[in-house]
Amino acid sequence: MSPSNREYSQFLIIDDDPGIAKFLVTYLRQRGHTCHALTDGFQTASWLSEHDCEVAIVDLRMPKVDGISLISFMREMNPSLPIVVFTGVGYDEEQMHAALRAGANGYVSKNLPIEQLYCVLARVLATCQQRKRSVPSAQPVLAGAA
């Protein structure tokens, strides 16, 4: 499964590690998607007010703003924006539930193969398409959960 619908091809990546952000941009662009990366969560509000994206990929641990607070802020700013957590925290049940309560639609550990993130993105996008067609939404998509 892949997020191949061109309607959902714009990704926003928010990760304080420039290497990971660059890797994700390269990986997704190689699959035909467009991407923009921010390495500072504080840039998110101004970027989202001027640009569109179909999915945000958010790290949880960042120095200037934590991912949970950022997810809550993004959810207030755009209630329908799909948000997927991509984190080095690993499978931490407390962090995962905090992210989901804040409004994340998916959760993937960075220690899993990158294909897991791509599968979660595909499922989250499929769920969003269902919502647009007024079909009841599915549960959050998790990767790395025991």
Regions found by a protein language model. Give the residues of each.
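Short amphipathic alpha-helix used as the core "switch/output" element in two-component signaling
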Residues: 46, 68-80
